[in-house]
């Protein structure tokens, strides 16, 4: 049982563990543990494997950029994990925990971050995270179409904020007591 008590409203963000990290169980577990150690609530979690068309749809804003094709192919190269995370400033906190996109820079200016410690290249940089609250809502819907963000904020957020909440190891998600 966890005694999470939050002062401010919780915010949701999407976190992806990319195929390079999921391919290595030690790295995948290390990222999962960093999420828990930084007191994120894991609202939803699933493993999935994209088709190339899924990757193209998700990264359509980057079409025409030099890295687009490499990114599309990489993101459909193997299984990945998707998380809906909650925290008071979830978007910014997850971005801080990930570190800079460019792995070489992350190693120098942000050691201790996921990308600084575990990233391989600028494409194989272990993680993705939403860059704004608006992006988070859009991206959560892309990966979890059955999840209603508005409904969660209205009905579930106050309950997760005040607890009690427990971590269900079998599902790798936090749950409200009694559910």
UniProtKB/Swiss-Prot annotation:
Pfam families in the cross-refs: NDK
What gene does this protein come from? nme6
What PROSITE patterns does the entry give? NDPK, NDPK_LIKE
| MF GO annotations | ATP binding; metal ion binding; nucleoside diphosphate kinase activity
Kindly provide the name given to this protein in its UniProt entry. Answer: Nucleoside diphosphate kinase 6
The protein's matches in CDD domains, at most eight in alphabetical order, are given as:
NDPk6 (cd04414)
Keywords carried by this UniProt record:
ATP-binding, Kinase, Magnesium, Metal-binding, Nucleotide metabolism, Nucleotide-binding, Transferase
Assigned protein family: Belongs to the NDK family.
Residues in the active site? 128 (pros-phosphohistidine intermediate)
Q: Which SUPFAM superfamilies match?
A: Nucleoside diphosphate kinase, NDK (SSF54919)
């Amino acid at each position: 049982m966890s005694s999470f008590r939050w002062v401010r409203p919780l915010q949701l963000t999407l976190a992806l563990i990319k195929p390079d990290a999921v391919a290595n169980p030690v790295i995948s577990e290390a990222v999962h543990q960093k999420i828990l150690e930084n007191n994120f609530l894991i609202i939803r979690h699933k493993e999935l494997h994209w088709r190339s068309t899924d990757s193209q749809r998700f990264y359509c804003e980057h079409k025409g950029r030099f890295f687009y094709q490499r990114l599309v192919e990489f993101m459909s190269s193997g299984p990945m994990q998707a998380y809906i995370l909650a925290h008071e400033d979830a978007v910014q906190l997850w971005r801080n925990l990930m570190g800079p996109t460019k792995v070489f820079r992350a190693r120098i200016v942000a050691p201790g971050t996921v990308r600084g410690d575990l990233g391989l290249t600028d494409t194989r940089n272990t993680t993705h995270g939403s860059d704004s609250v608006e992006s988070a809502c859009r991206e959560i819907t892309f990966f979890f179409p059955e999840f209603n963000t508005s409904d969660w904020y209205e009905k579930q957020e106050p309950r997760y904020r005040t607890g009690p909440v427990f971590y269900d190891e079998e599902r790798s998600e936090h749950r409200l007591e009694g559910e």
